[in-house]
């Protein structure tokens, strides 16, 4: 019963609730039926009187008819500027827009009506029918600010600057003259230029030597020169239009934009610079660098450039610049990046690590050069890599911050570019040689292969980097050296002339490394177990890992700095990348010298001989000078003597090191199988000796 009552109550509630719902649905259906009487209209058309479609205002079907009769008809834009009936006054510039049009003119200043031909100055008095409502800004800079992109602003400003200069010089017969124009928000002065002439506009001055500066354009007479100051244009053409390839933290405009122009049919070339004294807009910052720039217009728009201009002097009130051409000028105040705690710590690690690497690279190079028993193709590669890294690190420590003069900085940047590219090229040759050696362990005539490699490794190791640097210098020599460091500029991707080859070599060496590990694993597993048990597993593993860094593969860690990772991860990667790579010289000395058994024995013999010589000197102080000289002599034979390093009674086969793996067996414990294994290993000894 209770369930039945509940069900009955629910039904009644649903019935009562459905009454207004049904009324609402019925109303909606009625509205839909009414509107359904009008067909679906095409783009730029609307339903009229619920019966047919018509084109919106500013559109027609192409037959001077707005009503759409056939379903396939489309509404097209009306070009009001081409109609027989004039819509703009004679002095106005008519511009067609989609669905409308604009009449542009300068009402209060007819002399500057040409400005309306560059930018849209929408005013009711420009229309034949004054009732047209425009609502647009009439101020020139206000119109420029309505452009959507920087490129559009730059293009409009470039046209404006050129037109203003041309109009003031060529369409203004009243010279000399000093005037202002509120529409353009400018002040200007024109003079007849024959000798040294000083012009002033808006607390800015320009000093030009017309006698020497415009000889080719004067033709013995006077010429007109103009100096224009734009009060508000700097709000648009600000520091963001400066191509900041130098990596400044902030670049701001700190003067009015000024223009210097001469009446001439051709662009004048000045033999003497023009001196510009520009008033500072804001107080100067002691950390900032002041850049004298000019506006360099182009088809893409334009930008601020320092070409042809240099900074002379700056105080709290004004800045003096000198330029060897006439254009539009300004002063930019550029703040360098402040070195935070992380960068400071990384700098300390870099300088300490590179200093230690220099010492190790020097010792390694001396070892590879003077130790005759270990000299082969491998040590030749080690020697060239050590020399390149030593010179590159030394130049980095002493010259990376020598940004003045610019020419010296560019030379240092070019030399660093070459030396580091050469270092990477020798790393590539190291990896290639190691891979070929391991791949041909069964080749008996290995020495001929080594001589063949020497024929091309010097041209590749030194010639190919020279070619890359030469092409880069020809294509963009201005990109060598920046305001902050003597290195490659980031402008237009010039840094890829180094990063491209380096990344390719890192990838190739990484492939070589894993192939070598795979080949060695299969080779070692086939050797006699007694041979393999003689190896020091810890040293072998350590040297195999270090070999990865010696080949430059660790530089690939730097890629993680540029990808989207967490701040903590990026910080860890930055420290890891810096520590590993600045210590590359230490790792080279460690793996190829200190952990090389033969080199260690040579070091011991050398120190033993040196100690004996010192002891001999102390006991023979009273001897003759001739005997003393003989005691002090330490020739190359004594440093690394050629001969057997072991006692004949306990001789072993020459030790072999393959990517950190030593293979050697005493003769007294070798069977025929062991001899084959030892001989097999003997031919692979040059891998990392």
Swiss-Prot record:
Q: Does the keyword GTP-binding apply?
A: no
Q: Where in this protein does the record put region GPS?
A: 292-339
Its GO biological process terms?
epidermal growth factor receptor signaling pathway
**Ranges where the GAIN-B domain occurs:** 182-339
What tissues express this gene product? Answer: Predominantly expressed in myeloid cells. Predominantly expressed on resident macrophages.
Q: Which residues lie on this side of the membrane: Extracellular?
A: 38-350, 401-407, 477-499, 566-570
Detail the disulphide connectivity of this chain as listed in its UniProt entry: 38-47, 41-53, 55-75, 81-94, 88-103, 105-126, 292-321, 309-323
What the record says about its domains? The second EGF domain mediates the interaction with the putative ligand.
Family, according to the entry, reads as follows:
Belongs to the G-protein coupled receptor 2 family. Adhesion G-protein coupled receptor (ADGR) subfamily.
What is the name attached to this protein's record? Adhesion G protein-coupled receptor E4
> Which organism's genome codes for this protein?
Mus musculus
């Amino acid at each position: 019963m209770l369930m039945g009552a509940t069900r009955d109550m629910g039904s009644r509630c649903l019935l009562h609730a459905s009454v207004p719902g049904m009324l609402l649905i019925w109303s909606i259906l009625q509205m839909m039926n009414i509107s359904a009487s009008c067909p679906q209209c095409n783009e730029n058309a609307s339903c009229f009187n619920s019966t047919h479609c018509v084109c919106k205002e500013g559109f027609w079907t192409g037959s001077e008819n707005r009503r759409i009769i056939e379903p396939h008809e489309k509404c097209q834009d009306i070009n009001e500027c081409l109609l027989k009936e004039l819509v703009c006054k004679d002095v106005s510039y008519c511009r067609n827009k989609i669905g409308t049009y604009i009449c542009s003119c300068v009402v209060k200043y007819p002399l500057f009506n040409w400005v309306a031909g560059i930018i849209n100055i929408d005013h009711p008095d420009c229309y034949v029918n004054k009732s047209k409502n425009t609502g647009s800004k009439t101020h020139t800079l206000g119109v420029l600010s309505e452009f959507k992109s920087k490129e559009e602003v730059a293009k409009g400003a470039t046209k404006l600057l050129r037109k203003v200069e041309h109009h003031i010089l060529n369409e203004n017969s009243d010279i000399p003259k000093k005037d202002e124009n509120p529409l353009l928000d400018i002040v200007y002065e024109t003079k007849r230029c024959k000798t040294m002439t000083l012009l002033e506009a808006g607390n800015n001055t320009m000093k030009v030597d017309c006698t020497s500066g415009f000889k080719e354009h004067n033709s013995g007479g006077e010429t007109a020169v103009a100096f224009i100051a734009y009060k508000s244009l700097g709000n648009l053409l600000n520091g963001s239009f400066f191509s900041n390839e130098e990596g400044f933290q902030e670049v701001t405009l700190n003067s009015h934009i000024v223009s210097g122009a001469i009446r001439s049919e051709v662009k004048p070339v000045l033999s003497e610079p023009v001196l510009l004294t520009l008033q500072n807009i804001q107080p100067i910052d002691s950390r900032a660098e002041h850049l004298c720039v000019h506006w360099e217009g182009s088809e893409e728009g334009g930008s601020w450039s320092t070409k042809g201009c240099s900074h002379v002097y700056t105080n709290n009130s004004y800045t003096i610049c000198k330029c060897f051409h006439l254009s539009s000028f300004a002063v930019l105040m550029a703040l360098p990046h402040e070195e935070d705690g992380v960068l400071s710590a990384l700098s300390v690690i870099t300088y300490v690590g590179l200093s230690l690497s220099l010492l190790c690279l020097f010792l390694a190079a001396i070892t590879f050069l003077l130790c005759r028993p270990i000299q082969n193709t491998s040590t030749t590669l080690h020697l060239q890599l050590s020399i390149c890294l030593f010179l590159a690190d030394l130049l980095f420590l002493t010259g990376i911050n020598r940004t003045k003069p610019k020419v010296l900085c560019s030379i240092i940047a070019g030399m660093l570019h070459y030396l580091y590219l050469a270092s990477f090229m020798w790393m590539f040759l190291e990896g290639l040689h190691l891979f070929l050696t391991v791949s041909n362990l069964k080749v008996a005539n290995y020495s001929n292969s080594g001589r063949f490699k020497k024929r091309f490794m010097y041209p590749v190791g030194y010639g190919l980097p020279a070619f890359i640097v030469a092409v880069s210098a020809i294509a963009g020599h201005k990109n060598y050296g920046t305001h902050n460091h003597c290195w490659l500029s980031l402008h237009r991707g010039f840094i890829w002339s180094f990063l491209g080859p380096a990344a390719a070599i890192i990838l190739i060496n990484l492939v070589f490394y894993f192939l070598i590990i795979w080949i060695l694993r299969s080779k070692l597993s086939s050797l006699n177990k007694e041979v393999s048990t003689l190896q020091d597993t810890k040293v072998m593993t350590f040297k195999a890992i270090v070999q990865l860094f010696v080949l430059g593969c660790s530089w690939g860690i730097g890629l993680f700095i540029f990808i989207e990772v967490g701040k903590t991860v990026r910080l860890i990667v930055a420290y890891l990348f810096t520590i590993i790579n600045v210590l590359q010289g230490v790792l080279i000395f460690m793996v190829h010298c200190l952990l090389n058994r033969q080199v260690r024995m040579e070091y011991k013999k050398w120190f033993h001989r040196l100690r004996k010589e010192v002891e001999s000197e102390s006991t023979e102080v009273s001897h003759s000078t001739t005997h003393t000289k003989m005691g002090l002599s330490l020739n190359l034979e004594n440093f690394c003597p050629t001969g057997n390093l072991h006692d004949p009674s306990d001789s072993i086969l020459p030790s072999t090191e393959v990517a950190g793996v030593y293979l050697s067996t005493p003769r007294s414990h070798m069977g025929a199988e062991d001899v084959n294994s030892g001989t097999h290993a003997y031919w692979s000894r040059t891998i990392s000796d």
